[in-house]
């Protein structure tokens, strides 16, 4: 028994000290906030917003131990000129979030991109905050800026 106890203790400590992306997998229920823009020039900022209840789901990718963000967000297009909040047109956002969940929660966030749409996800315990942002070019494309068009706050 004296020989087994230290081995068992080391095994338990190894399992508890090493976190993986699996700890963030699951369904988060919360509120989507859709920002509205008065003109096609979204750099002027949002004029109002709508909120709707919804869910975001994170699935584990067994090949890379990453997370798939699987979420249904009404985005009629990836261009702000055609973006209408709550338009009813659904795009599925399947993103592989690879840089989440290293040992001891050193990292608990990731940003991934689809074309000029960026998704930033931050986990905090059983809570998640996600932002969908549109990248716009400024000064002839020399500089870029990101404008938030959708936010999500939820808990597991």
Name these PLM-found stretches.
Residues 1-18:
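Sec-dependent bacterial lipoprotein signal peptides
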Residues 17-31, 122-125, 156:
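N-terminal helix-cap/turn-to-beta initiation motif at the start of protein domains
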Residues 25-68, 111-118:
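Short, solvent-exposed loop/hinge segments that bridge or flank secondary-structure elements
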Residues 35-43, 106-108, 135-145:
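Flexible, membrane-facing loop/turn or short amphipathic-helix motifs
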Residues 125-156:
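Edge beta-strand at a domain terminus
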């Amino acid at each position: 028994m004296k020989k087994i106890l230290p081995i068992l203790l080391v095994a338990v400590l190894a399992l508890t000290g090493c976190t993986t992306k699996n700890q963030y997998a699951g369904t988060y229920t919360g509120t989507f906030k859709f920002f509205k823009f008065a003109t096609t020039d979204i750099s002027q900022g949002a004029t109002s917003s709508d909120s709707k209840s919804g869910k975001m789901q994170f699935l584990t990718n067994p090949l890379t131990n990453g997370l798939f963000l699987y979420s249904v967000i009404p985005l009629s297009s990836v261009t702000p000129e055609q973006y209408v909040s709550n338009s009813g047109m659904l795009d599925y956002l399947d993103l592989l979030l690879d840089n989440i969940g290293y040992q001891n929660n050193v990292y608990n966030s990731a940003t991934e991109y689809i074309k000029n749409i960026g998704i930033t996800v931050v986990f905090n315990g059983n809570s998640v905050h996600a932002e969908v942002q549109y990248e716009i070019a400024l000064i002839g494309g020399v500089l870029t800026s990101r404008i938030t068009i959708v936010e999500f706050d939820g808990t597991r």
